[in-house]
From Swiss-Prot:
One of its GO terms (cellular component) is cytoplasm. InterPro entries: PyrdxlP-dep_Trfase, PyrdxlP-dep_Trfase_major, PyrdxlP-dep_Trfase_small, Ser_HO-MeTrfase, Ser_HO-MeTrfase-like, Ser_HO-MeTrfase_PLP_BS, SHMT-like_dom. One of its GO terms (molecular function) is pyridoxal phosphate binding. This is Serine hydroxymethyltransferase. The record marks H225 as: Plays an important role in substrate specificity. HAMAP family: SHMT. Pathway: One-carbon metabolism; tetrahydrofolate interconversion; Amino-acid biosynthesis; glycine biosynthesis; glycine from L-serine: step 1/1. It is found in: Cytoplasm. (6S)-5,6,7,8-tetrahydrofolate binds at L117, G121, H122, L123, E242, S350, P351, F352. The lineage of its organism: Archaea, Methanobacteriati, Methanobacteriota, Stenosarchaea group, Methanomicrobia. PROSITE patterns: SHMT. Its cofactor is pyridoxal 5'-phosphate. It comes from Methanosarcina mazei (strain ATCC BAA-159 / DSM 3647 / Goe1 / Go1 / JCM 11833 / OCM 88) (Methanosarcina frisia). PANTHER family: SERINE HYDROXYMETHYLTRANSFERASE, SERINE HYDROXYMETHYLTRANSFERASE 1. Catalyzes the reversible interconversion of serine and glycine with tetrahydrofolate (THF) serving as the one-carbon carrier. Also exhibits THF-independent aldolase activity toward beta-hydroxyamino acids, producing glycine and aldehydes, via a retro-aldol mechanism.
Amino acid sequence: MSYIEKIDPELFEAIKNEADRQEHKLNLIASENYASRAVMEAQGSIMTNKYAEGYSGKRYYGGCDFVDVAENLAIARAKELFGAKYVNVQPHSGSGANMAVYFSVLQPGDTILSMDLSHGGHLSHGSPVSFSGKLYNIVPYGVSKETEALDYDELLKLAKECKPRMIVCGASAYPRVIDFKRFREIADEVGAYLLADIAHIAGLVVAGVHPSPVPYADFVTTTTHKTLRGPRGGMIISKTEELAIGVNKAVFPGIQGGPLMHIIAAKAVAFKEAMSEEFRQDQDQTVKNAKVLCSCLKQKGFDIVSGGTDNHLMLVNLNNMNITGKDAEAALSKAGIIANKNTVPFETRSPFVTSGVRLGTPSCTTRGMKEKEMELVADYIEAAIKNSENDALLSEINIKVRDLCLKFPVYE
């Protein structure tokens, strides 16, 4: 870091302040986590200097011997982790991975059946403001009004009506187990491709604490950060060699040029870390922590979407607390708790205001927090949201949160 301090003190100050924020604030953003020092070292390595258009053994540049080693390691480890045959580790992001899958088998105007963003889906699954919503005919599905969970019978009915070319399952704010086998059956009924986007739950999947879509989906996409605790990036698993060939062409030269070899090296490191028993235990603890936090909030009168959680996150509908998601996020931030406002199923407010907050336990679990700490966190959340305009009290909670964080440092 001394090089940055010497050359660019302004940026150094921002990085230093961000490090302080990460250490002393409690992060409950479900899509964030803390990468290991080894992962960050790989990201900052000399691999960043190398252009490597193409694929291992078939590059458009010379001097790729060692970046080939890095990419081959990442691919082999991903195959082992996920029990997959065909893997592409070059996508720069999860959205890019989804784009490559779409481009590999779909034509503009084809119908995609995917989860509505306001019900827990993702922008890249067909939101009107995303490329996916502009290029394809999107038919959204959502959760049941009664259970706030997926209704697979209704989903089958909708699939038969719209006859999609592709069905997308996976979400960014869905707290329940996804039945990938049932999705496969529905896709087969209508002759559709099945894409499973497991960006949020990939770590849980490789640890065996959430069912895997790999045996069922034609394509599986994921980010490599979030629960996988790797660098920011994407990955695609294809079911057959034929599909994999199409995906590889869609990634390069379809939507990308040179791969980010320093990021691919960091992916290799993260995949090796994810093979450890410690990682498996952390993923198991992540779910345990989410269940305890969820249960404590329910006992305090909070309305939990779908009544609970099976994974690393929960959605809190704040309508019964007479506060918006935006205001709750602001109050929590003043209390030292970082979360994000989120739409809830059958939302009536703007996405910039929302009626809910999304809470996740990956980051606090990586710090070493367990069930006992989640009970404390629930107390802090309750106090902050129920006293959202009491700045003095929010400052007191902030001190308690800071003290808690100091007991569980991110980086020793």
